[in-house]
């Protein structure tokens, strides 16, 4: 994996095996099972499949690939929308590094935020879902994970 390149891919287009490997790793990490055999049986995969992929499949939150994320937003031009986004990042221990905001055009503004996720208190996926639920967040994309 020294010269590996990483991709961010929506799990909807991947074979189920990858998500099942993640589930088995989570069972092991949280001590809900005694070992690999029990974990693989619980999620319905073979041990060989688990061992084949376990070192190559991560969630965004689990990955040691990087500790900075760049998010791109399309926000409606209403009072408090950006403040609410920043609040969610802050209360989850995200450390905001940069914010770039364009002037609103047709009542929408593009915003890019880079923040450190080293100390976040929730999974990145959960934080993103929380941000997406804010009234006025019209679009959110992960541009980079470093």
Swiss-Prot record:
InterPro entries in the record: ACT-like_dom_sf, ACT_dom, UPF0735_ACT_dom-cont
All copies of domain ACT, residue ranges: 70-145
Source species, domain of life: Bacteria
CDD domains (UniProt xref): ACT_PheB-BS (cd04888)
NCBIfam families listed in its UniProt record: PRK04435.1
Family stated for the protein in its record: Belongs to the UPF0735 family.
Protein name: UPF0735 ACT domain-containing protein Clos_1956
